[in-house]
Amino acid sequence: MVTDHSTPVTGRPRVAILFGGRSSEHAVSCVTAAGVMGAIDKNKYEVIPIGIAKSGQWVLASGDTSEWSLSSAALPEVAPSGRTVTLAEVGGEHQLIVTEPNAVPQELGSVDVVFPLLHGPWGEDGTIQGLLELSDTRYVGAGVLASAVGMDKHFMKVVFESAGLSVGPYVAVTDREWSTDAEAVRKRVDKLGFPVFVKPARAGSSMGISKVDSMEGLDAAIDEARRHDLKLVIEAGIVGREIECAVLQGRGTDAPRTSMPGEIAVAVGEHQFYDFAAKYVEDGAAALSCPADMPDEAIARVRELAAVAFDAVGAEGLSRVDFFYTPAGELIINEINTMPGFTPKSMYPQMWAASGLAYGDLIDELIHLALTRKTGLR
């Protein structure tokens, strides 16, 4: 195991913070990066911010967190640049190279670990993870398979069911099914009963999600979800409290660590569920209660099942696992998020803080886990 990850120039491991990306969650990724860059111990790590524009271009970004923070005026966005950043192997080391037209490429030095703070497709779904695996670069978080499964709400449920976890009623709808026989899809949804939640299969931050109370609203909700992904998951509404649990990979062969469960309380008003605005935009629209007001045995069960879900998809580093806690005391798993947000309003760091692990220490532990794990098959 490699133990010395410091660079000869600074004596500190170099951490490339990767954010932005091509998905509809671009702005959320920028806000997450602002949170991490503001809290990371710069006496311990040398931070290199790399933004990915919506075009897919990698650029050397500003380390000024105010440029990436959420404001009421505008959502943050990585702008394209004439200078492109690439990750290449030079002399046996992973080097960041800056290229621009009619100029000699500039070497920025080696990278010890990448922190991919990307949400949604082309970042959280195994694509970036595959690129980093191919380049034999260490990185924070889940690998290719776990990231892909954790991004696809359909196959995620298939894996959960195979692990013995309770999953609510749902139907998966492909582009071909909706395009060739929409009426058959409507009949399948009708059997679920209303209300239902129509969701893009591969999107996060509640992008494109609609609550539908009757058949009359189904087609419009499907059209909205298909703007984000042509594959959909339509779930039966479940009466229950929304309970979340943060999971952190154990060191070495230790079991996953779990936080105290938290409960999401959404303010009554325009929000029928925990949507994008409640998560990121509107102050006071949602609040976390941690630990959740539950019997001790239910709390223990949430933590146990969260660890089962983490292992079921083969997650590494971190994940947030969401459940419904029904009036009958049943725990129904909703989803796993293999790269949960780190914004000031994000639940993952809040739950760990309530469990005794501060934000900066959490970031430090995630980087430690990435630096000390093997590359390649593991």
From Swiss-Prot:
Cofactor(s) this protein requires: Mg(2+); Mn(2+)
Pfam families, sorted: Dala_Dala_lig_C, Dala_Dala_lig_N
Domain ATP-grasp: from-to ranges: 157-368
Keyword Disulfide bond in record: no
Cofactor info, note text: Binds 2 magnesium or manganese ions per subunit.
Record: residues binding Mg(2+) 2: E335, N337
Subcellular location: Cytoplasm
Gene Ontology CC entries for this record: cytosol
Main location: cytoplasm
Record family assignment: Belongs to the D-alanine--D-alanine ligase family.
Protein name stated in the entry: D-alanine--D-alanine ligase
